[in-house]
């Protein structure tokens, strides 16, 4: 779909995405002077902000993450009570829930399979989380 959307975006200096979600368009288009994102889920916008401003802190948390039901439950707790946690902890919770939940849904149950694919999926996501995102 991006191959159809990106050519329709006119030349601009300010880009606003009111319903950010996965931010696919934002990351696929060329960067501009100012980019504004918003989403009904404040934790998503916190994730993108933290990845930009506190990348090292977030990367450290992500690198320590194992595919575990307990960590999934802890991430869900952080997501339910964000006011008690730092931006990096909240961003980690978003990352962990998206990577460890059934169907990658933040409000999904713990995802597992009998073939061992989920731990590999989490490890691959850890390896792919670089400053280039």
Q: What function would you assign to each model-found segment?
A:
Residues 1-2:
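Conserved SAM-binding loop and adjacent beta-strand
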Residues 8-69:
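Conserved S-adenosyl-L-methionine
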